[in-house]
C-alpha cells in the first residue's frame, strides 16, 4: 500500500480510538419482535427504528415475495432508463393520497433524498436556514449545494427570525428542519416555522423520517397534526425504513417541485431503482399504517411511559416528547462504559457519540416500539437505573 496514505489512515484511526469515537460492526440476528441476538447474546431491542414492528409483519413479507415473483430480484436500471416499474407509480399515488399532495418521487434512501433535494434546489446565490440539530444528510446537502449556510440554535425561532431579517433580500431563502429530531426525540415548531417562511418569502422543506407512519391523521406525519398546516409546507421528505419497516424514501409536494427534482436531482438520476420487493412491501405498509391506529396508539403510550419513568428516576432525557428517548451522559468514556454494562445486562443500548451528536453530549439513544409491553419497559428501566447507580453516573 502507498506509505503516505497508510500513515495518514493509521493516524486517523488511532485518533478515533483515543477519543472514544472508533466504531465497530457487530453481528445482529433477530430473535423475536422485540428481542435480538447481538454478539451471541439475547437482548431487549431498544435501539431499532422499527417503530411499529412492521418489518417482520407477514403481510409485508408476502407483498415483497409477490413483487419479486412478478418483476424479479432487482430493478436492473435507474428509473429514468428502464427501472420505473408500475409499482413506483402505484406507491407514488398512495403517497399523494396519504399526504394530500400533488406529486411524489420515490428515491433510494433518506440520506440521498436530503442530499439530493437541497443540492438540487439551492445554489451559491441562495441561503439555507437549518436547525443546528438537523440530520447529517441535511448538512451534507447544504454543503454540496454551495449555498450560504445559516444555522439557527435548536428550535430557537427568535434566532431564526434574526437571521432571516438580516439576510440579503436578493437571495432566495430555504428553511429546512427535521420534524422529530432523531437523537433528541423532541419536535420542531412547524406552525411557527411556516409563519416565518411566509413572512420572509422563503420555502420550507421538512424531514419526516422519524414521524412518517406515526403522527398526524393516518400517520401522515407531524405536519398533519394541525389542520391545513401540511399544505403550507413546500416539500415533505419521509422514509420507508423506520415506522414503515421497509427501505427507501419519498419527496412530495407541489408538482413543479417534484418535476424539477426528477430532472435535476443527481442522487435520483444516477442510481439504480429500488428492487420490486421493497416497493411491494412499501405499498402494503402505507396501507397498514393508515388503518392500524392501535399500533400508533401503543407506540405513543409506550413512549410516554418510558419517558416518565426515566425522568422520575432522575435521568437527563432532554426535551424528548416522542418514542425516541435519549439518556444524555456527556463524555464518550462514560457513555461507552454505560452501554457496555447495559448490553451485558441484556439491553441493546447503543452509545451515540460525536460527530452524530455535539461534543460533550454523548448519550444512549433508546427507541421504544409499539410491540414492547409495559413489562418489557419496566424490566429495562429497573436495570438501567440499577446500573447507573452502580456506575455513579446519573442517579
Curated annotation (Swiss-Prot):
Q: Is-annotated flag, keyword Transferase? A: yes
Q: GO molecular-function annotation terms?
A: 8-amino-7-oxononanoate synthase activity; pyridoxal phosphate binding
Pathway stated in the Swiss-Prot or TrEMBL entry: Cofactor biosynthesis; biotin biosynthesis
Which residues bind pyridoxal 5'-phosphate per the record? Answer: 110-111, 182, 207-210, 239-242
**How would you classify this enzyme at the top EC level?**
transferase
What are the binding positions for substrate in this chain?
A: 23, 135, 356
Is Transferase set as a keyword in this record? yes
Keywords carried by this UniProt record = Biotin biosynthesis, Pyridoxal phosphate, Transferase
Q: What quaternary arrangement does the UniProt entry report?
A: Homodimer.
NCBIfam families xref list: bioF
**Assigned protein family:** Belongs to the class-II pyridoxal-phosphate-dependent aminotransferase family. BioF subfamily.
Q: PANTHER family in the record, alphabetically?
A: 8-AMINO-7-OXONONANOATE SYNTHASE, CLASS II AMINOTRANSFERASE/8-AMINO-7-OXONONANOATE SYNTHASE
Question: What name appears for this protein in its UniProt entry?
Answer: Putative 8-amino-7-oxononanoate synthase
Look up and give the organism this protein is from. Answer: Bacillus cereus (strain ZK / E33L)
The gene that this protein is the product of is bioF
